[in-house]
Swiss-Prot record:
Disulfide bonds: none annotated. Belongs to the bacterial ribosomal protein bL21 family. This is Large ribosomal subunit protein bL21. The keyword rRNA-binding applies. It comes from Streptococcus equi subsp. zooepidemicus (strain MGCS10565). InterPro entries: bL21-like (IPR028909), bL21-like_sf (IPR036164), Ribosomal_bL21 (IPR001787), Ribosomal_bL21_CS (IPR018258). It holds the Pfam family Ribosomal_L21p. PROSITE patterns: RIBOSOMAL_L21. It comes from the Bacteria. GO terms for biological process: translation. HAMAP family: Ribosomal_bL21.
Amino acid sequence: MSTYAIIKTGGKQVKVEVGQAIYVEKIDAEAGAEITFNEVVLVGGDKTVVGTPVVEGATVVGTVEKQGKQKKVVTFKYKPKKGSHRKQGHRQPYTKVVINAIKA
């Protein structure tokens, strides 16, 4: 059974495995930089360890592959018969990380 972990990053929990590429909320790091996730909630595999609230001494190491922005989301507000409308767009920034190791 392959080892996996659940980490907390950007206010969300993400299940990761070694070699997997994940998209997370923007992290201030250059492409190619190595980052460490210290908030590991669960480590699974042959023996599952659940943290209370985090697993002590467990870390997940990854490499930043690229920074980017998601597709544009457009919001449009409109009031009938008043000639009032507002169009606004938003592109959420993200970081693509490739998981290198899970240390439990």
